[in-house]
């Protein structure tokens, strides 16, 4: 039987996958060839949920998703559902690349 935290985490993974146009990874990335919790064509998302007001982000969590995303030719994203608010954490270089892409697209319109 799943705990309340597991149920909430799966609910948020499903929500994020739908919003990003991706799919939730079976077994939350436990298989060697399908890492991350949510996969899109561009992003590999590791998702963390807590009903608490704080959450510690350890370097090991970030390093894990970065390494898995690089091996999968995707951008790493850490999705966090914290105290009823949702956040996505990306590498600074990826954020700058996304901003430049948006600028270029706007110029073509």
Kindly label every feature range from the protein language model.
Residues 1-109:
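Catalytic phosphate/metal-binding cores of nucleic-acid and nucleotide-processing enzymes, i.e., regions
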């Amino acid at each position: 039987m799943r705990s309340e935290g597991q149920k909430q985490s799966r609910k948020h993974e499903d929500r994020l996958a739908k919003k990003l146009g991706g799919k939730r990874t079976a077994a939350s990335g436990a298989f060697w060839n399908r890492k991350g919790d949510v996969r899109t064509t561009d992003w590999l998302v590791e998702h963390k949920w807590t009903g608490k007001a704080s959450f510690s982000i350890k370097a090991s969590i970030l390093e894990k998703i970065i390494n898995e995303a690089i091996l999968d030719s995707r951008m790493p994203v850490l999705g966090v559902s914290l105290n009823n608010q949702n956040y996505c954490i990306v590498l600074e270089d990826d954020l700058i690349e996304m901003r430049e892409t948006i600028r270029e697209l706007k110029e073509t319109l």
